[in-house]
Amino acid sequence: MHAVEEEERHEVDFLSRQVEDISDVNGSNVRIKEILSNQIVNQNDSFGKLYEITSSLDKYEPSEVLFYAAEVLAKLMDSQDVAIYTVANHSYARLFSATSPKARMLGNSIHYVQMEELYEKLREKKVFINKTMDERYPLMADAIYSEDEMQLILMVWGIPWERMTLGQANMLTVIGYLIQNAVVRANRYLSALEQQRYIHGTRILEADAFASLVNAYLNAREKKLTECALVVFEEGEISREEAAGVLSGMMRQSDYLGELSDGKMYALLANTSAEDAGMVVERFRSAGFPCRMKEEMEL
């Protein structure tokens, strides 16, 4: 009798565990169903709004478009951590805008061809998905091409694993195309005004164009989308045109020389912290160009 009771007790325990296992599986299935359902709903909702939201870039000045493209990308990917890099050549890319310290973790300049797993996908014009959660890479990335030349790299962090899907990758691709359209329009506009924007025979931006550019950077800095610094030059012994020729060779492609309404020449240092700007100022001075940081950057 005791043996029968013991056997029945074991059977009850076994069946109880089976019920618990089934409950766990059902719970997981419900969770998966919720994730997939939310993903579908969110994707449909986002696709319906994609054009409307990316079209908001058209309201900005051409020099502002890439800054706010980062905000648009963050909103549509539902992430607080996105970055946009501009490709400087066939090896390096420069950070243009980022929405958080996390999105700046790779630094102001990346040797993207050495980021092998990421570069392999981008070179194939595919979205990179960081399936191994390798901390050296963003969670997702896509490249924007123009005439088979890589122009921009979009990077996204801060998304949960359940959204690192092919559907989300397709969405990032569409967002990239729409951002590209806005950027191409802005660049065409700026190219059309090229001769009007620079002081004749120099690479010095005239006052209105330079003021617009500085304001774009200041507004983006206020929203923590970028860092920047403004350096003002004192009149030296050589002409401004000669000085601009030498200084341009000491500056990055992403930096600008220009005049403001006070008639002085300035350098706008993009994505540059105050500490780094201090080193640039010392380099300019050592080359014979007296200058200083403009502490109050309001125009």
Question: Residue locations for each model-derived region?
Answer:
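Short beta-strand-to-loop transition segments that serve as allosteric relay/switch motifs
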Residues: 153-163, 269-271
